[in-house]
């Protein structure tokens, strides 16, 4: 929006040329998003607290959660999305269809998450919408988004699947690209949602993955860097780095209030939207497998739930004391802050491994 206005004035004011640089606008989007969240965060929390928009706590969860977390406002994802939209709408190139695809995904999943949070708050339990309703809704949103992407995209690489470490291993998915993409978006959304169970646990890994993909989208959209790294050159993909900057800034601002002890939780409004957007970014940058590496913590959390469910249904026994796996370690006696920081460390290591795959081919 503001960027579009500035581009019309560049010929008259040469100092505005700096806005042509993606790195500059990525920084602006990050700081704008962070500033917006920090600015409205405190009144937002007070408003939600006054209206009893509070987070329901699982009855079977760790006792400490029932004691310490009850009465904490939820739906902080609204804060994150307001910050994210502020950054990208001001500093993003809105003529780039990748941006509109990502905005559709983050909005669709954010609205679904908000409805889920509303149900939890209204009925004062942690169940929310049914699993069937949530999955079907996520799939439908992803289908519409992917269909729009395939109609708008001029990228011949869109249906290709690239493998890190193997520079010549490329599989054209053909029609299977659509269900594959749906799986990535829905899976990523739910994985982040499952991870969001402790103060700050999901926020920092989301920041790390978004930072990795800010770099990946930048080099993928640069013909010189992409050729040097032997990764596919995708025209216009650099603009996605501005979107990633907005995610980073919004989450950094939110972390100010979500750091232990959390003053607000992002709820499904935030976790479903952020997870869905990361999945969508992985798809359009053609780094889906790298997404699974950098976001390995989210994968671990999701897999722990799948293992727990299947084990109990098949044998009647649970592998973990509680799933997702972060609750397992709490049940073993780890302090919440210990679990969070150690999981952050794991996420940092995975992010570095993911970035290393760009060169190790």
Swiss-Prot record:
Protein name as annotated: Phospho-N-acetylmuramoyl-pentapeptide-transferase
Function, as annotated: Catalyzes the initial step of the lipid cycle reactions in the biosynthesis of the cell wall peptidoglycan: transfers peptidoglycan precursor phospho-MurNAc-pentapeptide from UDP-MurNAc-pentapeptide onto the lipid carrier undecaprenyl phosphate, yielding undecaprenyl-pyrophosphoryl-MurNAc-pentapeptide, known as lipid I.
Localization, UniProt: Cell inner membrane
Top EC category: transferase
Known catalytic reactions: UDP-N-acetyl-alpha-D-muramoyl-L-alanyl-gamma-D-glutamyl-meso-2,6-diaminopimeloyl-D-alanyl-D-alanine + di-trans,octa-cis-undecaprenyl phosphate = di-trans,octa-cis-undecaprenyl diphospho-N-acetyl-alpha-D-muramoyl-L-alanyl-D-glutamyl-meso-2,6-diaminopimeloyl-D-alanyl-D-alanine + UMP
Disulfide pattern: none
UniProt entry tagged with the keyword Transferase: yes
Transmembrane segments: 28-48, 70-90, 94-114, 129-149, 169-189, 205-225, 237-257, 264-284, 289-309, 338-358
Cofactor: Mg(2+)
Keyword annotations of the record: Cell cycle, Cell division, Cell inner membrane, Cell membrane, Cell shape, Cell wall biogenesis/degradation, Magnesium, Membrane, Metal-binding, Peptidoglycan synthesis, Transferase, Transmembrane, Transmembrane helix
Keyword Protease part of the UniProt annotation: no
CC per GO annotation: plasma membrane
Pathway annotation from the record: Cell wall biogenesis; peptidoglycan biosynthesis
Mode of membrane association: Multi-pass membrane protein
Gene encoding the protein: mraY
Source species of the chain: Pelagibacter ubique (strain HTCC1062)
Chief subcellular location: membrane
Gene Ontology terms, MF aspect: metal ion binding; phospho-N-acetylmuramoyl-pentapeptide-transferase activity; UDP-N-acetylmuramoyl-L-alanyl-D-glutamyl-meso-2,6-diaminopimelyl-D-alanyl-D-alanine:undecaprenyl-phosphate transferase activity
Short name of any one Pfam family annotated for the protein: Glycos_transf_4
């Amino acid at each position: 929006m503001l960027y579009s206005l500035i581009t019309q004035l560049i010929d008259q004011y040469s100092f505005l040329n700096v806005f042509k640089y993606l790195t500059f606008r990525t920084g602006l989007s990050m700081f704008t998003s962070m500033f917006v969240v920090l600015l409205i965060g405190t009144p937002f929390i007070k408003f939600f607290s006054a209206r009893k928009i509070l987070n329901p706590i699982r009855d079977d969860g760790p006792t400490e959660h029932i004691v310490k977390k009850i009465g904490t406002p939820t739906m902080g994802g609204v804060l994150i999305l307001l910050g994210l939209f502020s950054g990208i709408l001001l500093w993003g190139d809105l003529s780039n269809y990748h941006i509109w695809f990502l905005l559709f995904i983050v909005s669709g999943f954010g609205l679904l998450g908000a409805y889920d949070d509303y149900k939890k708050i209204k009925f004062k339990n942690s169940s929310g919408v049914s699993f069937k309703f949530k999955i079907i809704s996520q799939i439908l949103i992803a289908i519409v988004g992917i269909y729009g992407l395939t109609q708008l995209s001029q990228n011949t690489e869109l249906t290709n699947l690239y493998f890190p470490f193997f520079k010549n291993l490329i599989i054209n998915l053909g029609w299977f690209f659509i269900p594959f993409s749906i799986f990535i978006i829905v899976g990523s959304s739910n994985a982040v949602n499952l991870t969001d169970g402790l103060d700050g646990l999901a926020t920092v890994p989301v920041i790390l993955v978004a930072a990795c993909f800010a770099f990946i989208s930048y080099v993928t959209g640069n013909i010189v860097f992409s050729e040097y790294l032997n990764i596919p050159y995708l025209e216009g993909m650099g603009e996605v780095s501005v979107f990633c900057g907005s995610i980073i800034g919004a989450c950094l601002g939110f972390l100010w209030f979500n750091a232990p002890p959390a003053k607000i939780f992002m709820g499904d409004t935030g976790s479903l939207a952020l997870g869905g957007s990361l999945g969508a970014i992985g798809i359009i940058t053609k780094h889906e497998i790298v997404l699974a590496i950098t976001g390995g913590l989210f994968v671990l959390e999701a897999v722990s739930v799948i293992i727990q469910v299947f084990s109990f249904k098949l044998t009647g026994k649970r592998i973990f004391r509680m799933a997702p796996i972060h609750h397992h370690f709490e049940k073993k006696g780890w302090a919440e802050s210990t679990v969070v920081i150690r999981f952050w460390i794991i996420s940092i290591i995975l992010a570095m491994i993911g970035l290393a795959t760009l060169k190790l081919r």
